[in-house]
Amino acid sequence: MSTNARSTEMTKPDERYDVVVIGGGAAGLSAALILGRSRRRTLVVDAGEPRNAPAAHMHGVLSRDGMSPAAYLEAGRREIAEYGVEWRAGRVTGAAPDGRGGFAVTLADGTAVGARRLVVTTGLVDELPKLDGVAERWGRDVLHCPYCHGWEVRDRAFGVIAHPMMPAHQALMVSNWSKDVTLFLHTADGLSAHDAALLDAAGVTVVAGEVAGLVVEDDRLTGVRLSDGRVVAREVVFVGADRLVPGDGVLRRLGAALRETPFGEFVTVDETGRTSVPGVWAAGNVTGPQEQVVNAVGLGYRAGVAVNNELLLGDLEDAVAGRPRG
């Protein structure tokens, strides 16, 4: 992968940064950008696993609508390099207090760096339903977000595979982009009378029965196959993940507080992204599943500002008290 960002080929174990950003997606690069502009020595460690990688294009990002996720991140890496931020391909396997008010950060290749503060932006993984064709077509004609992809597939024949927790929700959402929507109840227990009325008002057709998989012909989705053998012709399928798995291993090992959400456990943060662990911030989809690229950028920016402010004021307080800088 080419990038103009200055990559560290081999970081010395005793090398210390003001901030290590763990994760190089939209939130991480945004935090790194403001930290670099704040003259903070910053390292971004990026495992290269963005949630939106399967998509050919991203949408709803002002001035970048239609840009590929890979090109967007490449542009971000070029920008952070202008401010001296270092970028490194790698995976952080752990972080622990270093006894100096900061953290020792270990990487999978055995190297280690020090950080006065951490910003964790490691995103999440969508665990998709185990149905034939879903994973293979994900991000192409199997989609989850109409705001991200609805315009590009408008007026086609939509199928929606119901999520057991909210069986009608996604079908109602996508009905604004097509008048030909079929909801497959799949494993959902059924519909409430209210949901059934809403679906009827939206013109959504409801099909009972468990989905077995998708029908793909000539590299094109053509239908949804039910377990009883029926095939319903469809051109696009919307489906939610069975489970959302945040990349929060480092945060959990540090003892960060978690909160329960309808989508599972996520790290608890304040409005700036500060976690319950002193010196550790988190931003982007690792903090919640509904952070689109534009939201992630804002959250990363906010975390970067908060980290810089804490370092600045902390250093001044130490200077006044005659303490060595942390």
Where do the PLM segments sit?
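Short glycine-/acidic-enriched loop or helix-start segments at secondary-structure transitions
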Residues: 31, 54, 97, 129-131, ...
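FAD-site-proximal beta/loop scaffold in flavoenzymes
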Residues: 7-8, 130, 136-152, 243-294, ...
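FAD-binding core/adjacent interface of flavoenzyme oxidoreductases
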Residues: 2-17, 87-156, 240, 263, ...
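A Rossmann-like FAD-binding core segment of flavoenzymes
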Residues: 5, 74-107, 112-115, 178-265, ...
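N-terminal glycine-rich dinucleotide-binding loop that anchors FAD/FMN and/or NAD(P) in oxidoreductases
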Residues: 37, 41, 47-49, 56-83, ...
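A conserved FAD-binding loop/helix module that cradles the flavin
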Residues: 32-33, 168-172, 283-326
